[in-house]
Swiss-Prot record:
The lineage of its organism: Eukaryota, Metazoa, Ecdysozoa, Arthropoda, Hexapoda. This is Kinesin-like protein CG14535. Residues 1-25, 472-494, 693-753, 905-926, 1016-1072 are annotated as: Disordered. Disulfide bonds: none annotated. Residues 44-396 form the Kinesin motor domain. Pfam families: Kinesin (PF00225). One of its GO terms (cellular component) is cytoplasm. The keyword Cytoplasm applies. Residues 483-494 have a biased composition (Low complexity). It is found in: Cytoplasm, Cytoskeleton. InterPro entries: Kinesin-like_fam, Kinesin_motor_dom, Kinesin_motor_dom_sf, P-loop_NTPase. The keyword ATP-binding applies.
């Protein structure tokens, strides 16, 4: 037989040539299944029996012990030893006569059936499952020379069998393996056209020796390993195989070629022969496992990639089931039963065939088709053992799944310990006893097992006991629970509970939906069953036990994690649920009705709707937002406050920490924003706008507050030590949220103040005398009522100049009232410092310190308005001189050092010119700043804290320090101002007045001054490149290095909107080299320029010798090295 097949394959080109010449047509059943695309879930096992034809060459002396019924798909076996007994023996042994054995299968084939019908029936469910992503397997089992090769491989000759009516072609005689290859590729092509999925098919083949159980499995395609790259299966494999070679097969002919190669290697590996049951010698072929690996993927609707790997196994056990050192057929049956029943450790695990079969058949989604083969020429025992193994696998497949039982029965069986395991293993008894004793109920309630005639027991024939027994075995009695009366039905109880809840619900719609449901449930007096009641700590109101968690003893809603059931309480909840069902429960979500959801959505859509009865759990809390829940329990004894309802102590601590962290961040950001010049200018503008809109205020406010830092305290959450009463649900509606702070988007230069508003504001200020008298009255009242507030913190340090000025002003008072007299009269003075927090200093400074800060705010407001009035329209003379230059701004002298970083604020230019001419007065007609000081009453601002070691800013040595250096600048500016304005007020007077204001203001307030707009014309802005009045110098000149390097950089003052690095000294030096409109340089400017160049060379010579890091740190912006002299260094 092997020689014949080999010659046919070599002569006709094998299966590859057969598929090229005449591929087998796809059967109609397979076409219907591929078009329907059924959902293949748990794998099925389909068992078929194929009986070969009787060999005509053999004698017909053997009795026929096998009867076939193809209509019923049954086979009947009769023992030939008891088929024709003698009459005497029959009478003596009448009770001992063995009945014929009947076996039923999914399909039954004989020699009269075509090969294509056998392949179509075996592969009709396997190939669609593989295309859907599941595994499929076709297994041929039986003793050697029983027709397994005919089923799997077929014949390459002309006819299919002796029962063929007409001679069919080669396509009708192909076996299941070539047909599976052809039909699988056709299905892949159709699936690719319909769904657009991409497929990749690879082939592998493994052989197992039939007579050497210790031999390892052999890779039959190892010779073609160099033709293919690494398989994707190496990333998916986790089995015993170790990875056979997977060769890429893009076409069906390529896969068939690999099948021919595997068969050639299989024949070489079989070397022993044995005597078959028919008496002829035949070689024992090794087992063959031919696998088609299908890799597919497609793009899903959501943009992802869906796909994976599926496998189609074609297994021919060949001659493994033999008695010459191989594995017996009963052993193969036990392996199959163990694997298909889900056992972890199948028998004969040392045999190389066992892990291979487990890898193919173990997946639960694998669809298996088993074809058992028998021959009439076999002995009765061999045929019976083969059919019994196939029948046991068939019964295993048809075993009904367990009926889903109620929870009570399942728990009772689990707790009792008498429950059976999930899957029963193979029957360890022999096949004879198993076939005689197993009785099951057929599809029509027939008491037959498919192997014997119906056997009726006496206990089942009386009355209707048979029907009751059938229902009991099928489990129908457990599916239907006993019916109850209509009054006690769960639906009636649900309706009653719903009606009761509707009556008890309050009329308010602002509460939480779940709290209303909980209130109705708790307040309802009609509860069907008795629930254990407990009381909250010190509360007289009872609460149902199922609403209270064991850890916190505080009522908790159903959606909280505290309510999750644990295994210990499963039986208790089951017993309560079996007694009566109180209310409808939504297991996987909140218990909210559809009407309440619609009501909540309607309330949330309203714009002006604010829920007043809910608490913002993770945000600010206020006294007005108290939660009014149904279980609003008072505290026990007044000492214990209510918490967050269902939250435990850990969650409460986390929320408190979160609130504290957010409070700290908000406070820091607000303080930093309020200290910036932009924020301060905006706050003062808002204050001034409010003061203009409000009616006239009284002369004195007995409780002044620090208005500058007020928003930072308002933005903090109100930390209430007592949490709100009652519990709060997580999914409550939105509560009242404080409005967001307005954003400051307008530039500072766009904030213009009219002259009318300024005069109106000045008229509302009190005079200096009234303010001083009010301060004295307030200080006396505060000292009489609160004597402890007179002790100001030692953090407010004073200097000797301030003490001297205070003593000179208070000469008429008692000499003993010295500011430091308390230190000499008190023996033990111990005051607690308040340097820890910035907020404590404001509360401990007393009334006087707050009044001083209020005065500082008003002074800043007035000074800002006066600077706004300084926006004058320049005359023609100014345009003719240097109106287009950045040096055209007036010079102001500040009493600070030349190397100070906080020298003077940078002045911002107006972004756009006004559409109307300015009606503000000129610079020469500015109001008297001394009069402003007298009106505002700023005499006491010198008492504010100065830096440690600072001298009196009112001393005149600060003015004399810079006056000699700016004589020429003052002369030049006075001439230009006199020509432009034509009035007697010179720049020195305005400068002197400005210095007086600067001396009164502390240094911290000076740094917060708003930006002074120089001109209302857009032409006043100079980019440094288009100005005609600025001298054009080369890149390496001294002027460019002086103007573009380091600290005195023109770009630093011009380009930065909030730069404060341009000092008055540097501006004065720039004015010395300013060129007039006619291009002539003044003599004073030329002399100053020469002196500056001489000083610059001297500094460059010194810088060449001082290149150390310390020298650069001392003078970082004036240290220029000779080798980098020509380059620009902008910081």
């Amino acid at each position: 037989m092997a020689t014949t097949s080999t010659s046919n394959m070599s002569r006709n080109g094998g299966f590859c040539g057969a598929l090229q010449r005449a591929p087998p047509p796809m059967p109609p059943t397979l076409i219907r299944r591929l078009s329907s695309r059924e959902c293949y879930g748990v794998g099925k096992v389909k068992v078929m029996l194929r009986v070969a034809d009787r060999d005509r060459n053999s004698g017909g002396t053997e009795p026929d012990f096998m009867a076939l019924d193809k209509k019923k798909r049954q086979v009947t076996l009769t023992d030939p030893r008891t088929a024709c007994p003698p009459p005497q023996a029959a009478q003596e042994r009448a009770p001992m006569v063995a009945a014929p054995k009947m076996f039923a299968f999914d399909n039954l084939f004989t020699g009269e059936d075509k090969q294509s019908d056998v392949c179509a029936s075996a592969l009709s469910e396997v190939i669609p499952a593989v295309l859907e992503g599941s595994d499929g397997c076709l297994l041929a089992m039986g003793y050697p020379a029983t027709g397994q090769a005919q089923t799997v491989l077929g014949e390459l000759g002309g006819g299919s069998g002796s029962g063929s009516a007409s001679g069919s072609g080669v396509a009708c005689s192909l076996g299941a393996a070539p047909c599976a290859i052809a039909w699988l590729y056709k299905g892949i092509q159709e699936r690719r056209q319909k769904s657009g999925a991409r497929f990749s098919v690879r082939v592998s083949a493994v052989g197992v020796s039939a007579t050497k159980p210790d031999a390892l499995s052999q890779d039959l395609l190892i010779s073609h390993a160099a033709e293919s790259d690494d398989s994707p299966g190496i990333y998916l494999r986790d089995d015993f195989l170790g990875g056979p070679t997977e060769l890429r097969a893009p076409t069906a002919e390529r896969a068939a070629l690999f099948l021919d190669s595997a068969l050639a290697g299989r024949l070489k590996s079989s070397g022993s022969t044995a005597s078959g049951s028919s008496g002829c010698a035949a070689p024992l072929e090794s087992a063959l496992i031919f696998t088609l690996h299908v890799y597919q993927y497609s793009l899903s609707r959501k943009g992802g990639v869906a796909g994976g790997r599926s496998r189609l196994h074609i297994i021919d056990l060949g001659g493994c089931a033999n008695r010459n050192g191989g594995l017996p057929l009963s052993g193969i049956g036990n392996i199959l039963l163990a694997i298909l029943s889900g056992q972890r450790h199948p028998p004969h695990k040392d045999h190389p065939l066992t892990p291979l079969l487990k890898d193919c058949l173990a997946p639960i989604t694998c669809h298996v088709a088993i074809v058992a083969h028998v021959r009439p020429e076999q002995s009765y025992q061999d045929a019976l053992s083969t059919i019994q193994i196939a029948s046991r696998i068939h019964r295993l497949r048809r075993r009904k799944h367990r009926v889903p039982m109620p929870l009570a029965v399942g728990l009772a069986q689990g707790l009792g310990g008498n429950g059976s395991s999930a899957g029963s293993g193979a029957d360890p008894s022999s096949s004879e006893i198993s076939a005689d004793t197993v009785i099951y109920m057929g599809p029509n309630d027939d008491a037959t097992d498919g192997e014997h005639p119906p056997v009726y027991l006496p206990s089942l024939t009386a009355g209707d006991n048979r029907g009751v027994m059938s229902k009991a075995l099928k489990g129908s009695g457990l599916e239907k629970p006993p019916s109850k009366s209509a009054s006690n039905s769960p639906m009636m109880m649900k309706k009653a509970m719903a009606a009761e809840k509707a009556k008890k619900l309050p009329g308010s719609h602002t509460g939480s939906l779940k709290r209303q449901a909980g209130a109705g449930a708790c307040s309802s007096p009609m509860i069907p069953h008795e629930q254990p009641q407990i009381q909250a700590m010190g509360s007289p109101i009872p609460i149902p036990r199922h609403m209270v968690s064991k850890g916190s003893m505080v009522p908790s809603p159903k959606g909280s994690p505290m309510r999750r059931a644990h295994p210990g309480a499963a039986l208790e909840q089951l017993e309560a649920g079996m007694r009566k069902i109180t209310e409808e429960q939504w297991i996987d979500g909140p218990r909210v009705s559809r009407a309440k959801v619609a009501e909540a959505r309607h309330l949330m859509r309203e714009v002006n709707h604010v829920k007043q009865c809910e608490t913002w759990v993770d945000g600010p809390k206020s006294q007005s937002c108290r939660s009014l829940t149904a279980c609003n329990l008072p505290a026990a004894g007044g000492s214990q406050t209510q918490g967050y309802g269902f939250m435990d102590a850990h969650k409460k601590t986390m929320i408190r920490q979160w609130v504290e962290n957010q409070t700290t961040q908000v406070f820091q950001s607000t303080v930093s924003a309020s200290n910036s010049p932009t924020a301060l200018h905006w706050k003062l503008s808002q204050l001034k706008q409010k003061s203009l809109d409000l009616p006239d205020r009284p002369a004195f406010n007995p409780e002044p507050s620090l208005d500058l830092n007020q928003p930072c305290f308002e933005s903090l959450p109100l930390l209430d030590p007592a949490p709100p009463d009652g519990d709060e649900d997580e999914d409550s509606g939105p509560s009242e949220v404080p409005p967001a702070l307005p954003l400051l988007d307008d530039p500072l230069g766009s904030r213009d103040i009219s002259q009318d508003n300024l005069h109106r504001m000045l008229s509302r200020h009190v005079s200096r005398e009234q303010l001083h008298e009010a301060e004295l009255v307030a200080s006396r009242a505060s000292s009489s009522h609160h004597p402890s507030q007179r002790s100001i913190d030692c953090g407010l340090q004073v200097t000797e100049e301030e003490i001297a000025r205070t003593m000179s002003r208070d000469r008429d008072h008692d000499p003993s009232a010295h500011p430091l007299s308390a230190l000499s009269h008190c023996d033990n003075i111990s005051f607690v410092s308040s340097f820890n927090m910035a907020c404590e200093s404001f509360s401990e400074c007393g009334e006087r310190a707050r009044q001083q800060f209020d005065q500082l705010a008003r002074l800043h407001e007035i000074f800002t308005s006066q600077l706004a009035m300084a926006e004058v329209t320049p005359s023609a003379a100014l345009f003719r001189t240097d109106i287009g230059s950045v040096f055209s701004e007036p010079v102001y002298h500040f009493n600070v050092g030349q190397s100070s970083v906080c020298s003077e604020p940078a002045y911002r230019l107006t972004p756009s010119p006004p559409k109307q001419p300015s009606h503000s007065p000129s610079q020469g007609s500015l109001p008297s700043l001394n009069g402003i000081m007298e009106i505002a009453g700023m005499d006491d601002y010198a008492l504010l804290r100065q830096p440690d070691g600072a001298s009196d800013p009112n001393l005149q040595k600060g003015e004399k320090r810079f006056t000699p250096q700016h004589d020429d600048i003052c002369e030049l500016d006075e001439k230009s101002m006199a020509a432009a304005v034509g009035k007697g007020n010179s720049l020195e007077d305005a400068q002197h007045k400005l210095n007086e204001i600067t001396n009164i203001l502390p240094l911290a307030a000076q740094s917060r001054l708003p930006l002074l707009p120089l001109n209302t014309s857009s032409e006043a802005y100079d980019s440094g490149h288009d100005s005609n009045s600025t001298p054009r110098t080369s890149k390496h000149s001294g002027i460019s290095r002086r103007a573009e390097s380091g600290y005195h950089s023109v770009a630093t003052v011009r380009d930065s909107d909030e730069s404060s690095f341009a000092s008055g000294m540097s501006k004065g030096q720039r004015h010395r080299i300013t060129v007039s409109g006619t291009g002539a340089v003044t003599s004073a400017g030329i002399g100053n320029y020469q002196r500056q160049c001489h000083k610059k060379r001297h500094r460059q010579d010194q810088a060449g010798n001082n290149k150390g890091l310390c020298n650069w740190l001392l003078t970082p912006f004036s240290c220029t090295y000779p080798e980098t002299e020509g380059e620009i260094s902008d910081f």
